[in-house]
């Protein structure tokens, strides 16, 4: 997100001097580089939401940008199926939302579905086809955008692994090595750390990160089941997760990933096992999740029952078999791909935030809930953020 804002600031000649600060020695180590790579078509979002406003236009812009540079892209589309018959009516809702947002969709029968994915199952005999969904390699997108920004001149990238302090009233950052940086305007696009950065400016104090980990499995190369398109279930639209789905990569010989899980992460960078656990945060978020379960706001209890334990292989396999019943455990292997969703919790409303959230601060703008489809819509969202 930060790179796209930098790109648009230069493209629109708003500034000629930009400093990008990252805590890692290489960009894309966290949210952006670990994105699924799916360029979403805009089917899931209410028309009045920011996500709906920018998804379709943003997807077209990013897709064109990728194609112009010859970067890998798999224009494979997406098909959505109801795993249970009573979910068929949700296909109509998704189609309505998609069309309202400018997306192209069409209903398929079982014959059309099986022509593309012979092993797929629809509980109602219908499916929803989205031809404009595509898949890219997100880290390559990040690296190419970084390269082009640096080639333009006027852009420097600073690694601040040891941390920094801010003096908002003086528009000054003080780094651990003793150096300082003054700025005219600061854009906080820190992803998993964005709430912490915002709080240093006195912004968004009623929000905190509630991270959810997305683990993936993948189909073994010798498996005869190899979907050529994205295969998604009809989601529970009351919670911000799309359910376990199949996604072919943008490689020359696509790898098909299955996931992600949507299990609580016990740290902002708790990608594997006990790695980077934050005990205080984990305890606070566990208590928060328990309260959400008891209150059952927005169907949260259903999320817990259906998705919170998908990190357990038998449960993930069961969820995947709702889409492809012939799938077996021996067809799967653990993928190296894992990400953490930068999900915000609103302590005032006691709910998960379900839309982008950009808040102003002193000489600063804070992008606090860059959830999906932020990667898809990144260029269009960058313009929206710049325009305030």
Say what each PLM segment does:
Residues 4, 169-277:
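Flavin-dependent oxidoreductases
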Residues 10-34:
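Glycine-rich FAD pyrophosphate-binding loop
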Residues 37-112, 116, 124-125, 243-245, ...:
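Dinucleotide-binding Rossmann-like beta1-alpha1 core, especially the glycine-rich loop
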Residues 46-57, 81-91, 128-147, 305-315, ...:
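Short beta-strand to alpha-helix junction loop
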Residues 72-82, 94, 101, 107, ...:
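Helix-loop-beta segment of a Rossmann-like dinucleotide-binding subdomain
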Residues 111-114, 135, 208-214, 218, ...:
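Flavin (FAD/FMN) cofactor-binding core of flavoprotein oxidoreductases
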Residues 127-185, 189-196, 377-387:
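Helical element adjacent to the flavin cofactor pocket in flavoenzyme catalytic cores
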Residues 251-329, 333, 371, 378, ...:
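C-terminal segments that line or cap access tunnels to active or ligand-binding sites in enzymes
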């Amino acid at each position: 997100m930060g790179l796209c804002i930098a790109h648009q600031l230069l493209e629109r000649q708003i500034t000629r001097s930009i400093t990008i600060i990252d805590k890692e020695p290489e960009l894309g180590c966290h949210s952006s580089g670990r994105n699924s790579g799916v360029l979403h078509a805009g089917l899931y979002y209410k028309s009045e939401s920011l996500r709906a406003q920018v998804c379709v236009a943003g997807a077209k812009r990013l897709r064109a940008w990728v194609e112009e540079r010859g970067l890998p892209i798999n224009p494979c589309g997406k098909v959505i199926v109801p795993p249970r018959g009573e979910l068929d009516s949700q296909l109509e809702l998704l189609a309505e939302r998609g069309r309202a947002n400018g997306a192209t969709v069409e209903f398929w029968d079982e014959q059309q579905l099986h022509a593309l994915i012979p092993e797929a199952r629809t509980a109602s005999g219908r499916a929803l086809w989205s031809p404009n969904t595509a898949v890219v390699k997100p880290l390559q997108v990040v690296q190419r955008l970084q390269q082009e920004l640096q080639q333009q001149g006027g852009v420097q990238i600073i690694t601040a692994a040891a941390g920094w302090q801010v003096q908002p009233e003086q528009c000054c950052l003080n780094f651990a090595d003793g150096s300082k940086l003054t700025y005219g305007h600061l854009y906080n696009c820190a992803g998993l750390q964005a709430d912490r950065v915002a709080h240093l400016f006195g912004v968004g104090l009623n929000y905190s990160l509630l991270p959810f980990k997305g683990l993936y499995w993948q189909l073994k190369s010798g498996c005869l089941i190899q979907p050529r398109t994205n295969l998604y279930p009809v989601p529970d639209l009351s919670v911000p997760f799309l359910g376990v789905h199949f996604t072919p990569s943008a490689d020359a010989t696509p790898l098909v990933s299955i996931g992600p899980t949507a299990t609580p992460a016990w740290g902002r960078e708790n990608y594997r096992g006990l790695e980077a656990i934050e005990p205080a945060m984990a305890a606070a978020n566990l208590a928060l999740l328990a309260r959400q379960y008891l209150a059952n706001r927005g169907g949260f209890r259903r999320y817990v029952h259906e998705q919170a334990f998908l990190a357990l292989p038998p449960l993930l396999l069961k969820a995947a078999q709702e889409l492809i019943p012939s799938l077996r455990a021996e067809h799967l292997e653990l993928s190296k791909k894992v990400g953490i969703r930068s999900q915000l919790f609103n302590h005032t409303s006691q709910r998960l935030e379900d839309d982008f959230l950009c808040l102003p601060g002193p000489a600063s703008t804070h992008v606090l809930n860059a959830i999906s489809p932020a990667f898809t819509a990144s260029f269009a969202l960058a313009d929206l953020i710049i325009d305030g």
